[in-house]
Amino acid sequence: TRQKAMAQYVFTMNRVGKIVPPKRHILKDVSLSFFPGAKIGVLGINGSGKSTLLKIMAGVDKEIEGEAVPMPNMRIGFLPQEPQLDAAQTVRATVEEGLSEIFGAKARLDEIYAAYAEPDADFDRLAAEQAKYEAIIATSGADTELQMEIAADALRLPPWEAKVANLSGGEKRRVALCRLLLSKPDMLLL
């Protein structure tokens, strides 16, 4: 029944603790649960465990006491304090990573369309696969270019062709945030 009670929450932590050498408790006996749509802030002085808490929630740090359980199939988006970006990429290429599922679906759809022309094509299998990828595109919004432009403008991103290597720390963080938002996570950790 405990599993049933947890199902109404999008995320639950039960008696979570984190110890780092030499036996320093960063988090101790933390229990919390979030309902869908909750907006929660975590406040504390430097070194009090805020970033550690977010890493645990994101599933990045699994070496903990207790349990941290997201709702099944929940997509968690996490923006670390120092986002890791490929310095050789452009701003556009980095932001497009947030839409990789859609771009992948579009590419696979093109392959499916071409496969219909093959003499031994399995139309039933192709039609089923086509429906799956068309559904991904339909639910994510067909106009990815417009989504990217709106997000880039809202976050005041540098020009698309700018290299990540030449960006300031704040610009890199905004590019990483744009990529994360476009991936449309169910839970966002900033």
Which role fits each region the language model picked out?
Residues 1-190:
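ABC ATP-binding cassette signature C-motif
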